[in-house]
Amino acid sequence: MEFCVLFGGASFEHEISIVSAIALKEVLKDRIKHFIFLDENHHFYLIEASNMHSKYFAQIKEKKLPPLILAHNGLLKNSFLGTKIIELPLVINLVHGGDGEDGKLASLLEFYRIAFIGPRIEASVLSYNKYLTKLYAKDLGVKTLDYVLLNEKNRANALDLIKFNFPFIVKPSNAGSSLGVNVVKEEKELVYALDSAFEYSKEVLIEPFIQGVKEYNLAGCKIKTDFCFSYIEEPNKQEFLDFKQKYLDFSRNKAPKANLSNALEEQLKENFKKLYNDLFSGAIIRCDFFVIENEVYLNEINPIPGSLAHYLFDDFKTTLENLAQSLPKTPKIQVKNSYLLQIQKNK
């Protein structure tokens, strides 16, 4: 089976998406037929596999690449001989952050009837916004940490609104990869933390910070009626897993497997199933959980995890191919014009 990797995008996580695509190339190798790069101006470009390395993208603004146009079933490429269509195999949406995870690309791919692996529109909207994720989890009976939601209008009253003690963690509501996230240990650190978070999002979440809390990450997908899980990761971290630890540490190829009881493993998987539901059909997602006093709490849903969390799966290629055979289908609307014909007939 062949794939096409779509990466880049106009978001703060643009470079992270490039790193993910390069990593996935090493895993899937010749199964990837095309690499499609989406730049910050929303232009699509075809990238040769031999150019999928960091040095090339560090200088990509100096390259003169012919832009492509997204169309039904593929991409259009203009040439001296006319317009040529590049037919796309199954697309892997690997655009992190805005564009890829907020629903824009999902709607575009669905509109042009291009088959893809990744979250659909509703799943993207709910998981990209951390506040909406909390509401979604609560409705499903999945616990989350207490929180305060701030915007520019009420940020001046932050200390009055926060009902829990220092330290607490400040994070943008609409951003991933630990961008704009800071731990606040005393009042004088709050202004900087808020300024940093509001750079990435119009809304900011504040949660209690629990030193040394147990954190477990679980990736997976639903293939027909059965769930396929990765092994459960227990991240090695300092206070929290920051941007550098996630994306600039190339010393690890495999994540540390968690040592936990069968009962706790089952709890994590049951919570994952509730969250995945049918909403995330067609996607490999990663749920990050906290365990506090033997209770499982959702930290966040990552709808497009870095490199699709391939490092957590014992057989990632098989998982991906099986998921490709179990994608949600959009019903085709049959337009018959029966009402218009009846109106015309009655004239």
Swiss-Prot record:
Its EC number is 6.3.2.4. GO terms for biological process: cell wall organization; peptidoglycan biosynthetic process; regulation of cell shape. Binds 2 magnesium or manganese ions per subunit. PROSITE patterns: ATP_GRASP, DALA_DALA_LIGASE_1, DALA_DALA_LIGASE_2. One of its GO terms (cellular component) is cytoplasm. One of its GO terms (molecular function) is metal ion binding. ATP binds at residues 161-216. It is found in: Cytoplasm. Residues 134-332 form the ATP-grasp domain. Its main location: cytoplasm. The keyword DNA repair does not apply. Pathway: Cell wall biogenesis; peptidoglycan biosynthesis. The keyword Ion transport does not apply. Its cofactor is Mg(2+); Mn(2+). Mg(2+) 1 binds at residues 288, 300. Mg(2+) 2 binds at residues 300, 302. Gene3D superfamilies: 3.40.50.20, ATP-grasp fold, A domain, ATP-grasp fold, B domain. It is an enzyme of class 6 (ligase). It catalyses: 2 D-alanine + ATP = D-alanyl-D-alanine + ADP + phosphate + H(+). It comes from the Bacteria. Keywords: ATP-binding, Cell shape, Cell wall biogenesis/degradation, Cytoplasm, Ligase, Magnesium, Manganese, Metal-binding, Nucleotide-binding, Peptidoglycan synthesis. Belongs to the D-alanine--D-alanine ligase family. Cell wall formation. This is D-alanine--D-alanine ligase. The gene is ddl.
